[in-house]
């Protein structure tokens, strides 16, 4: 036993000098192991070693044999401590660059891990983490994700709910620009601390040039490049370097500001030397743009003043680029004010014309007819003007007889001539209207009468001393019968006169019938007058109906100017005395009711528009022809009405009832 002890100690004593020769390898291995073991484990190992040193050799051998040979349980617990190393950084960077939060997307766990594993294999410088450690890192970066099991029966998979793959993968980060390796002997003895700043500046300048060429943007420092990458999300904003850059950004800006100011001053000095004077090119480049925006609203005087200012300021520009830009711009002209715009000479004059409508009957469609009226010289005519007219009167003149209503044309004899104008005294002029006179008058041939049977007509306006503008359009509403060239009211009036003569002849044979409201004449006269008035008329028919109305009024009223009127009145009185007082009262009442029915008829106003044209001779000829036709029709109607009114007076006095 005594011999075995020294033999057992001999390897230790012999091993020490051998260990001294090979002391480099164990020390390096121990240092590496200590770096991978935590302080708590190291303290436990040191405590165990102190206890083991008290054991005997057999005890130590027994302890050695009892140590576990397979992978120990402590290796799994030691891996989380390794996450702060290079493998953790690679996994963290890959997750931030390839994944992003999205609440409506799910990714299978296995597909995410397979992509990470391929990335590590492509680098060939780090081994991939286990699936458990990889899942822990994902939960640290995206704490809101949830694990879900999705898929059909037999094909279900566990997924990360709340993340998705990025559609735009960010660029890999730029390599570090710190020159820590410059202290190594590989850089050579030429590298010294003095030129180190120059190397850093040169490297930063090259990097900025490269970034400008790639990103199509100018950068003044490497810090701006890094900030641009962070702002555009080209690199991860949650990395440690990003936090350091954000924290130290203000301090670096303060340090960089003086250098940028000096660079700006040097640039300004160079530009001023190139221009040959003080810094003035920037000021005249802006006023032309401002004046372009304001030139549209300025007055011509102010625009000319600003134009002179531009002309004076442009030569002051020293840069040829500014001069070329100003030369290419068009000449600015002031906008013309609204007051200088010449108005259109033509004006629209609208006059109303009283046209009778059918009492209680349906309204007929009234077309609109355009008439071209050339300027016509003044047409004089002497006629009374006591009735209302449409428009002003043109020219004074003595009247030979009073008239109770508006008339169309001018009268030269005792009686009412139509006139365009309202006045209680005698007037001289031609107008557009309708009226009746108590004295037999003669209508001049120059009275303006509207021709019928045409939609576009040329008619002259009577006696207007003022100059007329050409191209004035007026429209008149004319019934359909007139527009189509028909003249049904003439036939109706003839038929009515024939009916009255036949009815009067029949009454002579037998005893007249009595009606509760009055005699037959009393009821027939208003209907006749209403039918004549309500029927749509042409201008020629207006003359005929006006003549008949004048005769009716003449018969109904006891007094009337003119010798012809008195003679007719005497004949009527003599015959009335023979017939009896009853028939005389009936005739007077019928004439009065006819007049009242005519007065109660409401006139319908219509719009009239006239277009003055160039033709004057044709208008005068049309006016003359229509006036002659109107006078002839008036005379014919006058005779018919007298016959129809005098026929009932030749009744047999014996046939009248007691």
UniProtKB/Swiss-Prot annotation:
Organism per entry: Mus musculus (Mouse)
Skewed-composition ranges (Basic residues): 506-516
Motif (PxLPxI/L motif): 172-177
Subunit structure as annotated in this protein's UniProt entry: Homodimer. The RFX heterotetrameric complex consists of 2 molecules of RFX5 and one each of RFXAP and RFX-B/RFXANK; with each subunit representing a separate complementation group. Interacts (via PxLPxI/L motif) with RFXANK (via ankyrin repeats); the interaction is direct. RFX forms cooperative DNA binding complexes with X2BP and CBF/NF-Y. RFX associates with CIITA to form an active transcriptional complex.
Disordered, as annotated region: 1-28, 250-315, 382-422, 443-602, 624-658
Compartment(s) where it occurs, according to its Swiss-Prot or TrEMBL record: Nucleus
Composition-biased stretches (Basic and acidic residues): 1-10, 277-309, 465-476, 489-498, 648-658
Family to which the UniProt record says this protein belongs: Belongs to the RFX family.
Gene3D superfamilies hit by this protein: 6.10.140.1290, Winged helix-like DNA-binding domain superfamily/Winged helix DNA-binding domain
Modification type N-acetylalanine: residues: 2
Entry text on domains: The N-terminus is required for dimer formation, association with RFXANK and RFXAP, assembly of the RFX complex, and for binding of this complex to its X box target site in the MHC-II promoter. The C-terminus mediates cooperative binding between the RFX complex and NF-Y.
GO terms of biological process kind: negative regulation of transcription by RNA polymerase II
Annotated DNA-binding residue span(s): 91-167
GO cellular component: nucleoplasm; RNA polymerase II transcription regulator complex
Keywords, in A-Z order: Acetylation, Activator, DNA-binding, Nucleus, Phosphoprotein, Transcription, Transcription regulation
Name of this chain's protein: DNA-binding protein Rfx5
Composition skew (Gly residues), residue ranges: 382-398, 406-422
One Pfam family from the record: RFX_DNA_binding
GO MF: DNA-binding transcription activator activity, RNA polymerase II-specific; RNA polymerase II transcription regulatory region sequence-specific DNA binding
Post-translational modification remark: Phosphorylated.
Residue span of region N-terminal domain: 24-89
PANTHER family listed in its UniProt record: DNA-BINDING PROTEIN RFX5 (PTHR12619:SF18), RFX TRANSCRIPTION FACTOR FAMILY (PTHR12619)
């Amino acid at each position: 036993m005594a011999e075995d002890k020294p033999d057992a100690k001999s390897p230790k004593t012999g091993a020490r000098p051998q260990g001294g020769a090979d002391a480099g390898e164990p020390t390096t291995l121990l240092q590496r192991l200590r770096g991978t073991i935590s302080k708590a484990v190291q303290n436990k190992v040191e405590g165990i070693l102190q206890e083991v040193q008290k054991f005997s050799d057999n005890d130590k051998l027994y302890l050695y044999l009892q140590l576990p040979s397979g992978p120990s349980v402590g290796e799994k617990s030691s891996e989380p401590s390794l996450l702060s190393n290079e493998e953790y950084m690679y996994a963290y960077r890959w997750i931030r660059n390839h994944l992003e939060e999205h609440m409506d997307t799910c990714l299978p766990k296995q597909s995410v891990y397979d992509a990470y594993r391929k990335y590590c294999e492509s680098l060939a410088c780090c081994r991939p983490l286990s699936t458990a450690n990889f899942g822990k890192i994902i939960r640290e970066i995206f704490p809101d994700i949830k694990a879900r099991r999705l898929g059909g029966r037999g094909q279900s998979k566990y997924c990360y709910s709340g993340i998705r793959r990025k559609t735009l993968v960010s660029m890999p980060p730029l390599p570090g620009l710190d020159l820590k390796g410059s202290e190594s002997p590989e850089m050579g003895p030429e590298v010294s601390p003095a030129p180190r700043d120059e190397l850093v500046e040169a490297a930063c300048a090259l990097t900025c040039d490269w970034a400008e060429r790639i990103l199509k943007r100018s950068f003044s420092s490497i810090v701006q490049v890094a900030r641009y990458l962070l702002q555009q999300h080209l690199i991860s904003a949650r990395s440690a370097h990003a936090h350091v850059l954000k924290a130290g950004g203000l301090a670096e800006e303060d340090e960089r500001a003086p250098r940028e100011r000096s660079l700006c001053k040097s640039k300004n000095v160079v530009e001023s030397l190139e221009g040959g004077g003080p810094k003035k090119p920037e000021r005249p480049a802006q006023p032309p743009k401002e004046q372009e925006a304001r030139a549209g609203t300025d007055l011509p005087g102010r625009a000319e003043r600003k134009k002179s200012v531009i002309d004076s300021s442009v030569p002051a520009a020293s840069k040829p680029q500014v001069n070329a830009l100003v030369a290419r711009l068009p000449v600015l002209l002031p906008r013309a004010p609204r007051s200088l715009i010449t108005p259109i000479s033509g004006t629209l004059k609208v006059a109303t014309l009283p046209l009778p409508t059918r009492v209680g009957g349906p309204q007929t469609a009234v077309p609109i007819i355009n008439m071209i009226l050339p300027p016509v010289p003044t047409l004089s005519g002497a006629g009374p003007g006591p009735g209302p007219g449409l428009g002003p009167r043109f020219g004074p003149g003595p009247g030979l007889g009073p008239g109770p209503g508006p008339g169309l044309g001018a009268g030269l004899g005792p009686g009412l001539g139509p006139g365009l104008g309202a006045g209680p005294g005698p007037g001289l002029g031609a107008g557009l209207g309708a009226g009746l006179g108590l004295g037999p008058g003669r209508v001049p041939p120059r009275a303006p009468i509207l021709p019928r049977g045409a939609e576009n007509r040329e008619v002259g306006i009577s006696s207007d001393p003022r100059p007329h503008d050409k191209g004035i359009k007026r429209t008149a509403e004319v019934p359909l019968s007139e527009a189509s060239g028909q003249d049904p009211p003439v036939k109706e009036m003839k038929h009515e006169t024939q009916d009255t003569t036949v009815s009067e002849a029949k009454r002579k044979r037998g005893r007249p019938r009595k009606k509760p409201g009055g005699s037959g004449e009393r009821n027939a006269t208003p209907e006749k007058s209403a039918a004549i008035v309500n029927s749509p008329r042409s201008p020629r028919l207006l003359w005929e109906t006006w003549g008949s109305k004048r005769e009716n009024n003449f018969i109904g009223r006891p007094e009337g100017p003119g010798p012809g009127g008195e003679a007719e009145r005497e004949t009527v009185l003599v015959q009335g005395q023979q017939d009896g007082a009853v028939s005389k009262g009936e005739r007077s009442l019928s004439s009065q009711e006819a007049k009242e029915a005519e007065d109660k008829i409401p006139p319908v106003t219509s719009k009239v528009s006239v277009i003055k044209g160039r033709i004057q001779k044709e208008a005068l000829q049309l006016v003359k022809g229509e006036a002659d036709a109107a006078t002839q029709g008036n005379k014919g109607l006058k005779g018919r009405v007298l016959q129809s009114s005098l026929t009932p007076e030749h009744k047999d006095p014996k046939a009248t009832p007691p």
